[in-house]
């Protein structure tokens, strides 16, 4: 089963998030939210996601507050914070990446969900080699 991540992004809701595209191109399932409140609703509806990718520049609430709200209902949920400066203004999340580095984002995702990511790689290799096809 593919890993599923929630991307909480400050981009315009009608646009396609770059981070979402990066994760989808790596064969992950991606849910999106554009506000803290929307992120909380999504995580309540889909509690078994593998992690959250959080833009630290969300409008409306400081990122530390958003993380606190998310942690209220999902204490151990891995959160990858993303900021343009490369430093974590939210208070020391375990995973932090620069906004403009897709490789860093994918590496953080692999660290969060290594077993499920290895399934994705294995399945992709099977498809490419023709193994397991009908």
Where are these regions (language model features)?
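Alpha2 helix of the CheY-like receiver
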Residues: 40-43, 106
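CheY-like receiver
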Residues: 116-134
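A short, hydrophobic beta-strand element within the central beta-sheet of small alpha/beta folds
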Residues: 67, 76-87
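Short hydrophobic/Thr-rich beta-strand motif most characteristic of the beta2 strand and flanking loop
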Residues: 7, 27-34, 42
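Conserved active-site segment of CheY-like receiver
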Residues: 10, 81-86, 98-99
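Two-component/phosphorelay signaling modules centered on CheY-like receiver
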Residues: 12-31
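Conserved two-component signaling phosphotransfer/partner-docking surface
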Residues: 101-107
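Conserved phosphotransfer microenvironments
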Residues: 36, 49-72
């Amino acid at each position: 089963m593919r890993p599923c991540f929630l991307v909480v992004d400050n981009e315009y809701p009608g646009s396609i998030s770059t981070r979402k595209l990066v994760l989808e191109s790596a064969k992950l399932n991606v849910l999106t939210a554009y506000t803290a409140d929307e992120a909380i609703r999504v995580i309540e509806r889909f509690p078994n996601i593998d992690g959250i990718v959080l833009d630290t520049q969300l409008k409306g609430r400081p990122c530390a507050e958003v993380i606190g709200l998310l942690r209220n209902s999902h204490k151990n949920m891995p959160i990858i914070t993303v900021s343009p400066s490369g430093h974590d203004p939210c208070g020391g999340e375990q995973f932090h990446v620069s906004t403009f580095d897709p490789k860093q984002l994918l590496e953080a995702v692999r660290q969060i969900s290594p077993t499920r990511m290895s399934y994705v790689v294995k399945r992709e290799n099977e498809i490419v080699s023709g193994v397991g096809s009908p």
